[in-house]
Amino acid sequence: MDFITLHNREIALNVAISGKGPLILCVHGWPELSYSWRHQLRYFAERGYTVAAMDVRGYGGSSRPHAVEAYTLRNIAEDVVAVINQIGAGRAILVGHDWGAPIVWTTAVLHPGVVTAVAGLSVPYMPVSNVSFVDSVREIYADRFFYMIYFQAEGVAEAELEADIPASLRKLYFAASGDAPRDVWLKRKPVDAKLLDGMEDPKPYPAWMSTADLDVYVEAFRTSGFRGPINRYRAQRLDPAELAAIKGRPVTQPSCFIAGERDIVRELIPGMDLFTDPGANCTDFRGSFIIPRAGHWVQQEAPAETNAALETFLSGL
């Protein structure tokens, strides 16, 4: 596996790349890195693909603009297109996890000419509407803590998470994993609580995340901090206006959805299972793969099962 630096105007993008063949471009979520795709890079490179994974702007070795507006879906989708074009493929299969899923879904709709197929992990496609997700749930969470609302105040979450980066990451990764009790991430807490309140730092740590793996993330976030990554949560409020031209538009490319059975995303709206019909807004949906016992970090917690699901999807293209 090699690392290359590509550019979208003034934004430098650190990209891991391996193999030769049709391009699969993987886009990570929060709080992760291109490293989150280590199991997929190796596996699909050995099966005749060029596999690339980018550090999203704000993360790792990529540029870290300060302004919130730099982190809109439109801007990050342009980064994705720049990576595809500069690798020289012209077109790519996109795979995205967590915030990476809305990024690849949006790229597929905004730039259909460069996206041949799309796989979303953990977050189903939800077309652009008049309000952002965080604003749509403010009333639901008016009397309790919700992490996306907590993230809106600049500097607050950054200070909490950067006070002890190793402990913060250990708690975050465990809390959203299939190994944690079901209610840890969405535990009912007072409105004025902090993100890490009530989160466990388990010992020993689950085997899917080794000490060496954790060290990669810790060193990256010691360098980058958390402002850029959290700015994506703030910039979502700008997306409806910026993406008004594609409001309500479906994904038309071949698509699939993959998630862990115990993923917290499915319960973000109390009383609703967001994984019930993940292909509702996709016109060529090829199937949903829900992986037993896995949590939010599905491609790391269950790499063999995730790779098998992706391979099934790819074989039908």
Over which residues does each language-model region extend?
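Glycine-rich phosphate-binding loop signature in dinucleotide/nucleotide-binding domains
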Residues: G19, I87-G90, L317
